[in-house]
Amino acid sequence: MAGVSGCIKYSMFTFNFLFWLCGILILALAIWVRVSNDSQEIFSSEDVGSSSYVAVDILIAVGAIIMILGFLGCCGAIKESPCMLLLFFIGLLLILLLQVTAGILGAVFKSGSDRIVNETLYENTKLLSATGESEQQFQEGIIALQKEFKCCGLVNGAADWGNNFQKYPELCDCLDKQRPCQSYNGKEVYKEPCIPFIKDFLAKNLIIVIGIAFGLAVIEILGLVFSMVLYCQIGNK
C-alpha cells in the first residue's frame, strides 16, 4: 500500500499553522474592536451599536472557529488522524460555502445595504444636538471623525450640532484652507458634511474586505485539497 507523502503532510501542517495564526489575529482584532473606547464612542447609540456589534461578534465567532479548525488540521496532519482531517475538511467546506453565500447575498442586496447605511446616518444626525450622556459619547466619536475627514456635521454641516455647537471648543474649525470653508456663528468651519466621507470610507474598506475574502477562499480551497489528499493517503496505508 502507498505511504503518506511527507511533502503533503508537512505542507498541510504549515498551511494549518498559518490558518491557526490567522484565526488568532481575527479573534484578537475583533475583541479589541469590541472593547476599545474609540469603538464604544462611535457605536454608543442604541441603533448603531446593536447592528455594529453583531458584526463584531460574528468576527469573534469566525476567529474562534478558524483557530479550532487550524488546530484540527495541524494535529490531524502530524498524528495522521483520519477523524481530525475529516472534521477539518467538513468544517472548512462549511465556512467556504457560507462565504460564497454571504458574497452572493451581499451582491444581491447591495442597494438595500446602501439604503440602510443612509437611513442610519440620517437618523443619528439628531444625536448631535442632543444633551444626554450616551449621546455625548456618540458626539465625541463624530468629532474625531470630523478631524480625520475635515468635515462638519453629518447632513447639514455645522447646523446639525444645534445648541451644542458652542459646547465643544474648536468644533469644525477650518484649519485646512484648501478645503471648502464657511462662516457659522462667528467662526470659519468646514462646509462639507461628513456623510459622503463616511460612505466613501465604508466603500473603500468593503473592497478590502472582498479582497481578503477572495484570498481566504483560495487558501481554503488549497486546504480542502491538501486535507483530502492526506486523508486518502492515510486510508490507503
Curated annotation (Swiss-Prot):
GO terms for cellular component: plasma membrane. It is a multi-pass membrane protein. Pfam families: Tetraspanin. Glycans are attached at N118. SUPFAM superfamilies: Tetraspanin. It is found in: Cell membrane. Keywords: Cell membrane, Glycoprotein, Membrane, Transmembrane, Transmembrane helix. InterPro entries: Tetraspanin/Peripherin, Tetraspanin_animals, Tetraspanin_CS, Tetraspanin_EC2_sf. The chain crosses the membrane at residues 10-33, 58-72, 84-109, 206-230. Residues 34-57, 110-205 are extracellular. Structural component of specialized membrane microdomains known as tetraspanin-enriched microdomains (TERMs), which act as platforms for receptor clustering and signaling. Participates thereby in diverse biological functions such as cell signal transduction, migration and protein trafficking. Promotes ADAM17-mediated TNF-alpha processing through recruitment of ADAM17 to tetraspanin-enriched micro-domains (TEMs). Forms a complex with RICTOR and integrin alpha3/ITGA3 to mediate mTORC2 activation and AKT1 phosphorylation leading to cell migration. Belongs to the tetraspanin (TM4SF) family. This is Tetraspanin-8. It comes from Pongo abelii (Sumatran orangutan).
